[in-house]
Amino acid sequence: MTDAPALRITVASASHVPALSDLLSTLFAQEAEFVPNHAAQCRGLSLIIENPSIGHLLVAHAGERAVGMVGLLYTISTALGARVALLEDMVVAPTHRGAGIGSGLLRHAIAHARSQGCARVTLLTDETNIGAQRFYARHGFVSSPMKPLRLLLD
């Protein structure tokens, strides 16, 4: 029996965009609110990568293959008087789930947010995704009394 290789997580570059878009398609296919759209996903990923003040994308690698990702988008909380992060698009390839990659990505994302001066990390999950809610609770996340609302702009 051989040990699994150490989890390698890097900040995404432009060369990661196609693989990250594939991971997003997996995620969006299982979320109630989104539909996979490769062109839109590539545009969004590229906007983040090209503008690090907006956020960072972190990539988990198995060898040379991207097998997981998570995004951190930055804003300011006037309540905290500090920079905060919105954690988005956390996904691990189905073939690599259950191996600790998600936990490693999340720990790395939290540490990365701290290193960027963030005072809080906020995330959203599907209301019915109890497994994800339990996963995040195991990592210290708690429910918020705030309810997200959206307005799509043309």
Regions found by a protein language model. Name each.
Residues 8-20:
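A short beta-loop-alpha structural element at the N-terminal edge
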Residues 47-59, 86:
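A short helix-loop-beta-strand connector motif used in the catalytic cores of GNAT acetyltransferases and
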Residues 59, 65-74, 86, 91:
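Conserved beta-strand in the GNAT
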Residues 92, 98-111, 138:
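Conserved acetyl-CoA-binding loop-helix of GNAT-fold acetyltransferases
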Residues 123-132, 150, 154:
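Conserved beta-strand-loop-alpha-helix junction that forms the acyl-donor binding cleft
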